[in-house]
Amino acid sequence: MRKETKENSVNLVEALGEGQWALRWDFKPKLNEQGEETGVNWYEEEVFLHIPQIDEIKEAVTNWQNRQTDAAILQGFRWQDMMVWLSMENQFNYKSVFDLASMTGQAIAAWDAEHPDLAGQEFVLRDVTTEEGTTLTVPVPTGRPREVLPVTFKFGTDEEPQYHEFFTLEELTEFYTSCMSYIQGCYQSGWTKKDSFDYTIYEELLKGM
């Protein structure tokens, strides 16, 4: 749980009374919108009903770090100045559309190369004579694979939605690879924070308890 204090430091492991013990980490200054210190410090705290052991400390901190990474992935990505919510559902939808558009694009290119006289045409007009002898001009499918694009995605928030229509595979590819690059960057940042977290200070504290 995120807490605030005007103190310049906190006890990382502290008895609260009634058998409760506080575990604290991520102590840092609270900043305003301009990035200036406010005189208040933030820290994370989890309360135990016993002295937390080092494996419990690692589990609590790791779970928090995972939540931080998940939150950054969910709501931290912006594309062309639009907020993109990267929920698991949205990630799946973006991947499905990208994969289908990529495969279809290759199939269309191959079909057009084999049928240069019909390239770019999903239908052609043909004259058909009915049983009554009437001639009708109707569209007839050529067999060319159907285009996936254009496709529209909803970005922004429910209160301020923004819609973007993708007309080309190149733009869709740029969007999707940007999403994947951002997600991978979030994971790498999370791994770095996990690897650099110093648990030795907690181990030393526990020795004296």
Language-model segments: residues:
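A preference for well-ordered globular domain cores
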Residues: R2-M209
